[in-house]
Amino acid sequence: MSSAPVELRDCPAPAKLNLFLHVVGRRPDGYHLLQTVFQLIDWSDTLHFARRPDRRLVRTTDILGVPADDDLVIRAARLLQAETGCTYGVDIAIEKRLPMGGGLGGGSSDAATTLLALNRLWGLDLPRAQLMKIGLKLGADVPFFVFGQNAFAEGIGEKLTPITLPPAAFVVIHPRVHVPTPAIFSDEGLTRDTPLTIITDFPDQQIVFAYGRNDLQAVAERKYGEIARALVWLRQFSPLARMTGSGACVFAPFDNVEHAQAVADQVPSEWEGRCAAGLTHHPLARFAV
């Protein structure tokens, strides 16, 4: 193991947006086959890590409804210990800003930031591909955050091709409803046979903001009226408004932060509105190669 710090503070766990999300089939084990473009944005949770000389894994922050042992950050650390035999432990504090059940990948991003940070803190120097393989055991979105850059994703979300996206700012609205992902994917009305997309469908990358649709959106709008209302409101300012992931957050792209912020400032008070800039890379991407 290489020399390593004993503490890493202010580690971002950025959100993602699904610029489109197509359900193209289903595996025999029930997992849905997807195609999507993942866009990183600068709205994030923040994690702090302090190395322990023992093997204990301690979440020092209470999170309502999420027992520490079930938290993806602890599960990620546990898997990393098991994979490497590392004898260190860690204290993890989380500043939670991303809404749970929002379709922003908050829990998955927290897990990926944990894998990346502990790779450095514990002096493991594991390659990115190995961290992505570990991350897949935690959830289909985790490998993307470890991958560390905007991507066209296939399979259950783990087959990733880097993609260059145009600069953009986004208005993201959380309608303050929690959407359990299984409730959307198990709905009989879900479209599961959207034709396959190939990455060369985006010769002009600007088209990606208007491309396709979110196949989960119609089901989510039917089940959760507040999502539908947020989309109607946002479409006053952009015809490109759509939902991310399985909801509940909706978003629209704008040419610059000033325009996006002006719209975000008008979001009705019963919802949470946010202006977020697009990122090209994960802030901790350098923690693995």
Curated annotation (Swiss-Prot):
Catalytic EC class: transferase
Involved pathway(s): Isoprenoid biosynthesis; isopentenyl diphosphate biosynthesis via DXP pathway; isopentenyl diphosphate from 1-deoxy-D-xylulose 5-phosphate: step 3/6
Q: Where does ATP bind?
A: 99-109
From the UniProt record, which GO molecular function terms apply?
4-(cytidine 5'-diphospho)-2-C-methyl-D-erythritol kinase activity; ATP binding
Q: Which UniProt keywords apply?
A: ATP-binding, Isoprene biosynthesis, Kinase, Nucleotide-binding, Transferase
- Pfam annotation, one family: GHMP_kinases_N
Any GO BP: terpenoid biosynthetic process
Where does the record place the catalytic residues?
16, 141
Segments traversing the membrane: none
| Reactions performed catalytically | 4-CDP-2-C-methyl-D-erythritol + ATP = 4-CDP-2-C-methyl-D-erythritol 2-phosphate + ADP + H(+)
Extract the Gene3D superfamilies matched here.
Answer: 3.30.230.10, GHMP kinase, C-terminal domain
Among InterPro entries, the record links this protein to:
GHMP_kinase_C_dom, GHMP_kinase_C_sf, GHMP_kinase_N_dom, IspE, Ribosomal_Su5_D2-typ_SF, Ribsml_uS5_D2-typ_fold_subgr
Q: What is its EC number?
A: 2.7.1.148
Keyword Kinase recorded: yes
Describe the task this protein carries out: Catalyzes the phosphorylation of the position 2 hydroxy group of 4-diphosphocytidyl-2C-methyl-D-erythritol.
Task: Give the family from UniProt.
Answer: Belongs to the GHMP kinase family. IspE subfamily.
How is this protein named in the record?
A: 4-diphosphocytidyl-2-C-methyl-D-erythritol kinase
To which species is this protein native? Answer: Ralstonia pickettii (strain 12J)
Which lineage is the organism of this entry classified under, starting from the top rank? Answer: Bacteria, Pseudomonadati, Pseudomonadota, Betaproteobacteria, Burkholderiales
Q: Which gene encodes it?
A: ispE
